[in-house]
């Protein structure tokens, strides 16, 4: 019996040390050395103060800001601890009601509804925390944001273009706009204006 237990205990201790201590320590040091921003949460600072993360969406509802994808997290929007989608199917009447309410909110904010509304402005993402929207969703909001900030639509469109990231490595994903970075660029441009 002793001959069976001893190797098991040794294996348990060795694997615990390797997988529970050594591997996490090596990965932490590697991450901090090679990818320090990402290892610390891709935090965005303004005037020495953390204002958000490039990886987690935030709620913007003032007309002078670009709005991101809607959050389905509970009990409050953009709650990272409650990440998850609404799980409403495409034929669920509740989803249709939510989309209609979101279109009405866009209309009430002064958005021109003569153009088709990009789907990412009226539906929540799978995680409920998406920090990015499509360039089409950003372009759809240019007129409203320009009017609210007393800027020309061309100036706002240039900021959208400057804050649009292409496909990763030229092939992965789709072009996207980080809403927090764009809104911070808008604030900076208006302060300089």
Curated annotation (Swiss-Prot):
Residue ranges crossing the lipid bilayer per the database entry: 7-27
A matching Pfam family: KdpC
GO cellular component: a single term: plasma membrane
Keyword Transcription regulation: no
Keywords carried by this UniProt record: ATP-binding, Cell inner membrane, Cell membrane, Ion transport, Membrane, Nucleotide-binding, Potassium, Potassium transport, Transmembrane, Transmembrane helix, Transport
Membrane topology according to the record: Single-pass membrane protein
Primary residence: membrane
Keyword DNA damage appears in the UniProt entry: no
Subcellular localization, as worded in the UniProt entry: Cell inner membrane
GO molecular function: ATP binding; P-type potassium transmembrane transporter activity
Protein task: Part of the high-affinity ATP-driven potassium transport (or Kdp) system, which catalyzes the hydrolysis of ATP coupled with the electrogenic transport of potassium into the cytoplasm. This subunit acts as a catalytic chaperone that increases the ATP-binding affinity of the ATP-hydrolyzing subunit KdpB by the formation of a transient KdpB/KdpC/ATP ternary complex.
Subunit structure: The system is composed of three essential subunits: KdpA, KdpB and KdpC.
HAMAP family assigned to the protein according to its UniProt record, in alphabetical order: KdpC
Similarity comment text for this entry: Belongs to the KdpC family.
Name used for this protein in its record: Potassium-transporting ATPase KdpC subunit
